[in-house]
Amino acid sequence: MPKPVANQEDEDPTPYLFVSLEQRRIDQSKPYDSKKSCWIPDEKEGYLLGEIKATKGDIVSVGLQGGEVRDIKSEKVEKVNPPKFEKIEDMADMTVLNTPCVLHNLRQRYYAKLIYTYSGLFCVAINPYKRYPVYTNRCAKMYRGKRRNEVPPHIFAISDGAYVDMLTNHVNQSMLITGESGAGKTENTKKVIAYFATVGASKKTDEAAKSKGSLEDQVVQTNPVLEAFGNAKTVRNDNSSRFGKFIRIHFGPTGKLAGADIETYLLEKARVISQQSLERSYHIFYQIMSGSVPGVKDICLLTDNIYDYHIVSQGKVTVASIDDAEEFSLTDQAFDILGFTKQEKEDVYRITAAVMHMGGMKFKQRGREEQAEQDGEEEGGRVSKLFGCDTAELYKNLLKPRIKVGNEFVTQGRNVQQVTNSIGALCKGVFDRLFKWLVKKCNETLDTQQKRQHFIGVLDIAGFEIFEYNGFEQLCINFTNEKLQQFFNHIMFVMEQEEYKKEGINWDFIDFGMDLLACIDLIEKPMGILSILEEESMFPKATDQTFSEKLTNTHLGKSAPFQKPKPPKPGQQAAHFAIAHYAGCVSYNITGWLEKNKDPLNDTVVDQFKKSQNKLLIEIFADHAGQSGGGEQAKGGRGKKGGGFATVSSAYKEQLNSLMTTLRSTQPHFVRCIIPNEMKQPGVVDAHLVMHQLTCNGVLEGIRICRKGFPNRMMYPDFKMRYQILNPRGIKDLDCPKKASKVLIESTELNEDLYRLGHTKVFFRAGVLGQMEEFRDERLGKIMSWMQAWARGYLSRKGFKKLQEQRVALKVVQRNLRKYLQLRTWPWYKLWQKVKPLLNVSRIEDEIARLEEKAKKAEELHAAEVKVRKELEALNAKLLAEKTALLDSLSGEKGALQDYQERNAKLTAQKNDLENQLRDIQERLTQEEDARNQLFQQKKKADQEISGLKKDIEDLELNVQKAEQDKATKDHQIRNLNDEIAHQDELINKLNKEKKMQGETNQKTGEELQAAEDKINHLNKVKAKLEQTLDELEDSLEREKKVRGDVEKSKRKVEGDLKLTQEAVADLERNKKELEQTIQRKDKELSSITAKLEDEQVVVLKHQRQIKELQARIEELEEEVEAERQARAKAEKQRADLARELEELGERLEEAGGATSAQIELNKKREAELSKLRRDLEEANIQHESTLANLRKKHNDAVAEMAEQVDQLNKLKAKAEHDRQTCHNELNQTRTACDQLGRDKAAQEKIAKQLQHTLNEVQSKLDETNRTLNDFDASKKKLSIENSDLLRQLEEAESQVSQLSKIKISLTTQLEDTKRLADEESRERATLLGKFRNLEHDLDNLREQVEEEAEGKADLQRQLSKANAEAQVWRSKYESDGVARSEELEEAKRKLQARLAEAEETIESLNQKCIGLEKTKQRLSTEVEDLQLEVDRANAIANAAEKKQKAFDKIIGEWKLKVDDLAAELDASQKECRNYSTELFRLKGAYEEGQEQLEAVRRENKNLADEVKDLLDQIGEGGRNIHEIEKARKRLEAEKDELQAALEEAEAALEQEENKVLRAQLELSQVRQEIDRRIQEKEEEFENTRKNHQRALDSMQASLEAEAKGKAEALRMKKKLEADINELEIALDHANKANAEAQKNIKRYQQQLKDIQTALEEEQRARDDAREQLGISERRANALQNELEESRTLLEQADRGRRQAEQELADAHEQLNEVSAQNASISAAKRKLESELQTLHSDLDELLNEAKNSEEKAKKAMVDAARLADELRAEQDHAQTQEKLRKALEQQIKELQVRLDEAEANALKGGKKAIQKLEQRVRELENELDGEQRRHADAQKNLRKSERRVKELSFQSEEDRKNHERMQDLVDKLQQKIKTYKRQIEEAEEIAALNLAKFRKAQQELEEAEERADLAEQAISKFRAKGRAGSVGRGASPAPRATSVRPQFDGLAFPPRFDLAPENEF
């Protein structure tokens, strides 16, 4: 196998190709709602999966997975595929086809390491950026010869499809691997080539191939060479192909590899001398520098530092993903495999290194001149040495080249820049020509001169590129990709639909909008970019500027794809124009395009190169004209444009057009490579990048055309030829291929929508052709099986006939020997023996003479035959030589014909192009005419519209007049309103003036006050200073009071909110604890249920084992019966043998004459015994047949009766289910009544004090409920009685099941016999098929002999005619010459007659041979017909046996299913009963806890009522305080001016406090939301638990119904089977024992069921109570919440009324105590949760111990299984020993049989006694044989018992493993719950810590305020004590401080700033 496929490890590729079953189950179990699931756009992920929550008009609310909800327009919402299409292999199969679905499928497959996906007709490959083992030898074998739908998506599947299409359709194929740069095209191309080399590998290997590698290896090894010299690192790709290549892989007629050739396109030469910072040059430069091949660096004169060579070190010099040393070794090995000589390799390396050295040649400016001169000769010397030329001459030609001016050559001096440019051009030219020479050399190596029939082309073109700097190379690359995309679009969307129309298929043309013609025309059409570039290249004075201007003037604004470039970013070069390609808009910089297009070289240096000593350098420049014009192609090879001047763009266009022509002549296969991200990281998908590529590549449109259209098609003759095997008789008389194809398709019963019949082809939808192939394979399989059976039948008949002939011959020989033994002692016979030889003595001599004469004649004939044979051989040799010559000439003609065909194909393609152009022009003309007609129609419409508009204008004028009148009215109203506004403005101005006057008055008063203060200060400075200090202190005091008031207000609000929040948290904590306790009880009950379930499973397993043992016993009895039958049949066979032997003895006695009377009596006795044996045999056969018929009849009757009984049981089960459903409905009604009662009771308890009289009504309702419960108890008893009846019926059903199992075993034995017969028939069919093949081979040989004989006969006929002609000539001569020559004529006549006689004899012999061959042929044909009939009969027998086998299988399967269903339903009902009993006990406990909680709530309700009363009292006090404050406000009205500033400060403080309140409310709402969310989660958990119980109850009801039906059916079957009980007495005994055990079990189950029923009823009552209690708790919680809201309102009002600091301080202390208590309760809850956590840990440890015990049990079971396996092997060995003993006994019997024959030979002498002894001995031997057979049967039974025991142990082991898995799942769930509890504890602690921190902060602020107030009070007291006497201006302050009150604002009283009342007044 070629190395790129085989050198990887053969790892299992399955995980990288298939979606595992487990993952598929996970994917398909994802939640999905077809109406709600949707995709919405996202900036980062492209699309997000969500669920529609609500719809409001065009806006849709979509909930995402993280809980986020987004509102989005409905048109942006996309549908979602069902989960079954998750990670689908072919996206054409998706039900919903849109961009998000395609993106999601590709992304999920990429994440699952599945990089290949089908997209309709083509394959999408995403670059994984890492190695996957999907290209190994093992993987390649998976895809070899497989259809696309049989294997997962892969590049190998596409490759194999192309290979098969090439061989099947005889059409050249092409594989177009496209995509952007870095998408993985080159790697996929290498894998494709390696695969084709593997598939087409030839098995022949000769010595020459071994020395340089096979053709397959050579094809593969071209990749390393081309990659080394043509690939480089770019920004987007570390191994980017910087050239395009089209590799043709040629195959011979048999599909074997016959050679290859490579075409390359546009190597990026500029990369040789310049690279960007993040890129590097071609790999070969860095590979040579790695030095991995010894001696190369020395040959190339290279150093170890890459930076010594500037032209290859301008960017990156190393690549992380590429090992240059290893790659260089592979490149060097590839040279060897491709047949490069050592000299050629070294020359390649030298030229490559010389390019590196040329970049280091240095030059400088000479003095004051413009000319350059060399700056050192070191690098130039190395270049000259490597090139094999003179250094001085090289520098001379570079600095002063000779140029041609007119007809003369002149020397031109160049400056440094010109010389540098010239060296760069030489570097590029040398490397480009070296690359082309390498390609040419590879093509020569791959040209094997073998016969080529078809090829597969693989295209690898550089992908679409958008860089920061895009030049001429990028334009050419992008133009190529544009053409390929257009080709793809044309193939997929245009040609496909045009072919539908051309073929007459009903099809509506779909315009996918994928036409790229405008962009292509912009580049390549006349006056396009390339044409303008070539035109500018012709003009000597043209520059880049003129080229840019011409482009802009020609296309800007006139061609849509030609656009202005975007402004450059900082540091970037400006672009000159931009083109809108299919993959995006690209900005191009045209700097240097003219030089690149001209590609000039220094002709003087080229001439020097052509004279160098490096042969390779001379060869690569051999086609360059140079200055002398002596190139190989100078005469006519490049005679294009302008006298031999050819540009790079024109050559590239020609290559591209040739490529497109080649692709159009092939059948294309597309592979789309996708780059997932720009970072080259594996497993990362950039959604927008991938979506852009999908849109550009037409992936969605390709899927749509594949789904809507008919991608597969075949010509009618081809279809008929390939699929005529499906219905050969139906199309036998049809000559029209179309009609025949239609008949063939209709015979397959395909849906008409899956195919269409065109004029010349039949079209199929995707995947249908694969179904046709499956039909064909199935048909071929049947035919081959029939042929094999026919041949085997023929061989069997032939062998049987031979045995019959041998038997007859043996009898004849035996008879003759017996006669001889009788006659040998007879004297007369002895005399006759002596006399007979003497009678023939006289005739011996005559016989000898006759034989000698005959021998002589034979020798003469032999000599004549030899002579004729030699002549014929010579003639044959001559004819063979002529044939060889004709074949040679024919092959030459074929080659010429192939050339003509290729030319014809090219002309046809050109014709098609012209026709397409003509068609396009005609279509455009039609479109223009349509447009003209449309314009005319539009003109008419416009005239009509104008007339209508005129009418509208008139109407509008009338409306305008009316509007003007309305306007006048409105203007009058507006003037009135303006007057009113002016009046209001005057009032406002008056008010403003009054306000201003009031302000001035206030200001005056302030000024007077200030003047008075100044006067006082002037009179008493010290006093003024003290007063000033007092004022400052008072201001500080006022501020402190305000701050304290604000703080106190905030503190009161925060504390009130905190208290409310803590109360709500406490309630929630209590609810949480209750729910947690309920969950814990549920978990414990679940564990107990699980334990009981396991116990029941153990019991079920025990019963199953008992059933299996009984079945095994029945099987043993059946086997014993069968053994008895076999023994009986064997005895009958031996009896028949004895009868036959008696007949033979009778014949012998008759021959001997029967001389004695004893012999006569013996004969009579023997005949009597024989007749008796015959009668016994016939009677036994008749009895056996009658018994068999009775058994069959009984079996059929039993089956019918069982079916009827099953139906009756099903009916009874349905009836019981109906009754149970009725009871269940009554139970639900009772529960509803209980719930209503609970609600009434709760309401009565809430208003118990006011509504005490309603208690009697509640009591009456309770009595009614008790009566209902009593009725329910009665119904329960009734149900228990019915349940006991059902159990009794179940017992009867189990007995019937045991009988059915016996019948099933008998059917199984019959099935095994039928299978054995079918196997024997299949073997006979195989034998007949082999014989048939041999006969065909013999028949072919005979036909060849007949043809050879016919040819020989024809030759002899020609010779005869020739002889006749010669005779005629001689006769004419004789008549003319006369009698003179009569003697000569006579002699000639005799000769001719002799020759004529010989010819006639030869003809006669040949005719005889022909006649014999004809007879042989006829005989063989008759035998073939006989064999055909035998095969038909065998097929009929086999089909009948298969039908019987299927019928028996079906019957057995139905009974198995019925028995399994009954057992499963019984187990399920028992399990559910146990579950309900445990649930009942659990609900009882929950009910008791609910009662306790109810009492606690009552007490709490009473406490809250007391608190409410206290609060109402406080509200009254608050009202009185408000009245006092209102009086104080009136007294302080006079101080309004003085306190205005304080009012403003109070307003600001109020705003701050309101903000704080809002923040606190926001925090409170968040806390409430969190609490509500947790409550909702708990409610959902409880609801899920309730639903689970309800589902279990429903399943129990269903199982009870099934049991009832099964019991009824079993009763009916029992009645019908009673008639057969007498015939099955032995089985009845065993069944009675099993029935007794079953009765015991049923009684036990009945008792358990009664207990379970009782427990179930109790559990239901408890559950109803718990549900009622839950409802009461919920209503109580709602009522408490309402009361809390009311209390909160009252409390806030009370707080606003109590603004004294003493009350605030007391509240603060109370709040501190409450927070401490709350903290203590939270700590207690934490400790409780920790204890629960420890309990859960202990439960987890117990579960782990149980799991360990289960594992130990499993290990024990495995040990037992191993022990039983050993016992099984021992039993098998014993059985083999018994078999050997049986064979030995059979051999002994055979020997005794021989002795019996000898004894019979002596019977005449021995008489009657000897016969009796022998018969006695025979009977003894038969007894021994029977005993031995019984022992053998016992051994077989023991063996089967052991096997069954092993199976049981394995089953038990599997059950243990499943139990272990269930335990592990339970452990995981408990661990998850533990984590949830921990998280809840942490959240509660965080809430408590937050509340405590808030309280401490408030308390701290309060203490600080109190300290500041105390200090201020002390200071004021001191200053007032000192300055009380002199306080003149302050004496007007009337109010004492104890009653100082804030002013009123907006109707609310502010709390007092401060109060100095002592603490004992609090």
Curated annotation (Swiss-Prot):
Residues 802-1927 form a coiled coil. GO terms for molecular function: actin filament binding; ATP binding; calmodulin binding; microfilament motor activity; protein homodimerization activity; structural constituent of muscle. Residues 1822-1862, 1922-1962 are annotated as: Disordered. SUPFAM superfamilies: Myosin rod fragments, P-loop containing nucleoside triphosphate hydrolases. Disulfide bonds: none annotated. Residues 780-809 form the IQ domain. One of its GO terms (cellular component) is striated muscle myosin thick filament. Muscle myosin is a hexameric protein that consists of 2 heavy chain subunits (MHC), 2 alkali light chain subunits (MLC) and 2 regulatory light chain subunits (MLC-2). PANTHER family: MYOSIN HEAVY CHAIN, MUSCLE (PTHR45615:SF27), MYOSIN HEAVY CHAIN, NON-MUSCLE (PTHR45615). This is Myosin heavy chain, muscle. It comes from Drosophila melanogaster.
